[in-house]
Regions:
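Hydrophobic packing residues within well-ordered alpha-helices of enzyme cores
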Residues: 18, 61-66, 121, 185, ...
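A residue-level structural signature of the nucleotidyltransferase/glycosyltransferase Rossmann-like core
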Residues: 51, 103, 110, 143, ...
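Short active-site oxyanion
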Residues: 48-51, 129, 227-228
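Conserved alpha/beta core of the MobA/IspD/sugar-nucleotide pyrophosphorylase nucleotidyltransferase superfamily
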Residues: 3, 167-254
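Conserved N-terminal catalytic core of the sugar/cofactor nucleotidyltransferase
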Residues: 1-9, 33-106, 110-118, 123
Length: 254
């Protein structure tokens, strides 16, 4: 691995949308295997370090869950005191990832992410750029508008945007060079408008800013399987991830 990569997992959500009562990263898939274990298996071979951002109430349980990896130095943990959104979680943890060349951001509920996608993203990434795996979706929840090497816009259903059938959606993975990244986030915050529904300054609209204003070229890694975009937001999503794992057909196998 020519570049030093730090994977960062924002996992400070409370799991309220799913009604689980625990952070989604700690939900059991089967036989003691949690979402965390699946993510770690996929990320560790392609990253030098994994950093996880948790909520105050999630810190102790997660440290227990990942005790072995933390003790080995392969994993570190920080706390997002207030749920201000993914951007706040990622950049609040900047001291942990800034020593590395590249940050590989992965949402903490992406149980269906394949090892092949992680490998291809890291291989395609260039330090100064922005690399995002995208997949066409029949009914996307988030849609990316791309023009050549530029990311024009990210539409978000959660903020009232209309996403078009067949549009490109992410799989919860974003690869960015760390040099100057926190400075660009600070600049972005000066004029960034809060989401019309959530009231949060979201991370996803920061990506078109990086592409168009900061001049970071976009590399799209095509993904064929739309199931990789399926996080765990509902009981149906959780059932899907569990059934795929038990069949041995979750992306990349066990």
């Amino acid at each position: 691995m020519s570049e030093r990569v730090c994977a960062v997992i924002p996992a400070a959500g409370r799991g309220t949308r799913l009604g689980s009562g625990i952070p989604k990263i700690m939900i059991e898939i089967a036989g003691g295997v949690t979402v965390w274990h699946l993510l770690y298996r996929r990320l560790r071979p392609r990253s030098e370090h994994v950093h996880v951002v948790v909520s105050p109430e999630g810190e102790a349980p997660f440290r227990d869950l990942a005790a072995e990896e933390i003790a080995s130095g392969a994993v570190s943990v920080s706390v997002q005191d207030e749920p201000t959104g993914m951007g706040g979680a990622i950049f609040g943890a900047a001291p942990h990832w800034e020593p590395y060349d590249t940050i590989l951001v992965v949402w903490g509920d992406q149980a269906n992410l394949s090892p092949a996608t992680v490998r291809r993203v890291v291989a395609a990434h260039r330090t100064s750029g922005l690399t995002v795996p995208l997949v066409p979706m029949a009914d996307p929840y988030v849609e990316y508008e791309v023009a050549g090497s530029a990311l024009v816009r990210v539409r978000q259903s959660r903020e009232g945007d209309e996403c078009r059938p067949g549009g490109l959606s992410d799989v919860g993975v974003f690869c960015l060079g760390t040099d100057g990244l926190r400075k660009e986030w600070t600049r972005y915050l000066r004029d960034a408008a809060p989401g019309t529904v959530t009231g949060e300054v979201n991370f996803l609209p920061f990506l078109p800013y990086l592409s168009q204003v900061a001049g970071r070229p976009l590399t799209v890694v095509p993904v064929d399987d739309p199931d990789e975009a399926r996080g765990i937001n509902t009981q149906a999503d959780l059932d899907f991830a569990r059934q795929a794992y038990l069949r041995g057909t979750e992306p990349g196998g066990r």
